[in-house]
């Protein structure tokens, strides 16, 4: 009987990508098969995230639950990866000695060797959280995909060192993946039926990959090359930094139809004073100028962003500046949360006199405004016929198909031949706007 692998993933899309590659890697090296039940697993991996508050405690709470599984099955192998693993390293083994392996985002390709060492000599403490550049992509097997969409990591790390952010310390400095390596993966995925590619990086628009001739390829050029791959009809990218949003990338919205009419561009705050304290490297007006230039090329584009509320020193005036920016741009959605200090970052040492109750109240006001704007945009879509990439059945209603619009809205609809439409584009007339999705009717039986 094949041995089983269980992976629990916290955090961002980059972690989702890394977890999928771990499954591919261990499937090839040790014939491990994925399971959805941790109780059936022979190997359990926890892929961690350090962005949100109490990330470490969340990890150790999960490891505490798995201690019982280890006691019942001493042969069970438990590994911890991701950004918390980079931060904590050996401390994870000290606090949770039942953990067998600790590895960082840049060393997940060494999992087969670590697993062999663990199984061969149980007393060896396997901890590897180094930053070996982009080496891991040279050792990972070709990805497998059974869906219409896929993530492709094009770079690792971040060199911006925003004062609130732990990513440069857990993922390392920016390193771009070679151009040919990215394109080989995209072509391989397209051959498996993938229609939409999401290019990933902590600061993806800083991508500067070399081709075999030694020429530098930026993100705009990469997107153009991905768009030329037969079968790829949609391209997204995330996450971006405003400073790196180049003229060529802006112009891509007028030149590459496969690039979707949706952009997630984190701004974090609408106050120049707070942006400077965050060391973001740009002003509000510089940010707005980029979005206005993109909107001139794509009038129907939707923008989403990230917002941190209650950054140390934030005044009521600073908060209102953020609210004004939200209304001015007409953001479609956001990831927004109350600031919490990340250990080892400069902002963790700043005085913070704003009461937590005030921060939570501001967050509620911001989220209410954004929810209103989201619904306004959704309601304007009612009556439109939208091009939907069908990704599968609705999790809440298996009788309905589910897919996404260009502006990243989930659309649920019924069809007489549902299984034949999965993985294809169809035209759907939007009939109803709901808080988190849209409903529609199939406008044409044709798939393409």
UniProtKB/Swiss-Prot annotation:
The answer, when asked if Glycoprotein is one of the entry's keywords, is no
The residues that hold [4Fe-4S] cluster 1 are 12, 49, 83
- Superkingdom, natural source: Bacteria
Q: How is the cofactor bound?
A: Binds 2 [4Fe-4S] clusters. One cluster is coordinated with 3 cysteines and an exchangeable S-adenosyl-L-methionine.
Q: Which reaction does it catalyse?
A: N(6)-dimethylallyladenosine(37) in tRNA + (sulfur carrier)-SH + AH2 + 2 S-adenosyl-L-methionine = 2-methylsulfanyl-N(6)-dimethylallyladenosine(37) in tRNA + (sulfur carrier)-H + 5'-deoxyadenosine + L-methionine + A + S-adenosyl-L-homocysteine + 2 H(+)
Q: State the Pfam families in the record.
A: Radical_SAM (PF04055), TRAM (PF01938), UPF0004 (PF00919)
Subunit structure of this entry? Monomer.
Please give the name of this protein. Answer: tRNA-2-methylthio-N(6)-dimethylallyladenosine synthase
């Amino acid at each position: 009987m094949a041995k089983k692998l269980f992976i629990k993933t916290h955090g961002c899309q980059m972690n989702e990508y890394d977890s999928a590659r771990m499954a591919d890697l261990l499937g090839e090296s040790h014939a491990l098969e994925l399971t959805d039940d941790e109780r059936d697993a022979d190997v359990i991996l926890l892929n961690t995230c350090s962005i949100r508050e109490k990330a470490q405690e969340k990890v150790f709470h999960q490891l505490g639950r798995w201690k019982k599984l280890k006691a019942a099955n001493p042969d069970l192998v438990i590994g911890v990866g991701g950004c918390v693993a980079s931060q904590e390293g050996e401390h994870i083994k000290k606090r949770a000695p039942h953990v067998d392996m600790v590895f960082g985002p840049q060393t997940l390709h060494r999992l087969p060797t670590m697993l062999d060492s663990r199984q061969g000599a149980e007393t060896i403490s396997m901890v590897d959280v180094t930053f070996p550049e982009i080496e891991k992509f040279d050792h990972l097997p070709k990805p497998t995909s059974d869906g219409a969409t896929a993530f492709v990591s094009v770079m690792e790390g971040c060199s911006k060192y925003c004062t609130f952010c732990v990513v440069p310390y857990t993922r390392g400095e920016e390193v771009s993946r070679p151009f040919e390596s990215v394109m080989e993966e995209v072509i391989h995925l397209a051959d498996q039926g993938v229609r939409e590619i999401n290019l990933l990086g902590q600061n993806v628009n800083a991508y500067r990959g070399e081709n075999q001739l030694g020429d530098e390829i930026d993100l705009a050029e990469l997107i153009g090359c991905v768009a030329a791959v037969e079968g790829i009809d949609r391209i997204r990218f995330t996450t971006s930094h405003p400073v790196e949003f180049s003229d060529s990338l802006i112009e891509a919205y007028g030149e590459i139809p496969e690039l979707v009419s949706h952009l997630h561009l984190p701004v974090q705050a609408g106050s120049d004073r707070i942006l400077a304290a965050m060391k973001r490297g740009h002003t509000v007006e510089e940010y707005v100028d980029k979005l206005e230039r993109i909107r001139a090329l794509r009038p129907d584009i939707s923008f989403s962003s990230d917002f941190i509320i209650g950054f140390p020193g934030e005044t009521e005036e600073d908060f209102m500046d953020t609210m004004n920016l939200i209304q001015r741009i007409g953001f479609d959605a956001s990831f927004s949360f109350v600031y919490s200090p990340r250990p080892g970052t400069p902002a963790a040492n700043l005085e913070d006199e704003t009461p937590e109750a005030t921060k939570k109240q501001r967050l509620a006001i911001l989220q209410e405004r954004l929810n209103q704007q989201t619904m306004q945009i959704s309601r304007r879509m009612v009556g439109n016929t939208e091009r939907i990439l069908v990704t599968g059945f609705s999790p809440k209603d298996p009788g309905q198909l589910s897919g996404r619009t260009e502006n990243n809205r989930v659309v649920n609809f019924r069809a007489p031949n549902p299984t034949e439409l999965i993985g294809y584009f169809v035209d759907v007339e939007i009939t109803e706007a709901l808080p988190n999705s849209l409903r529609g009717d199939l406008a044409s039986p044709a798939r393409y």
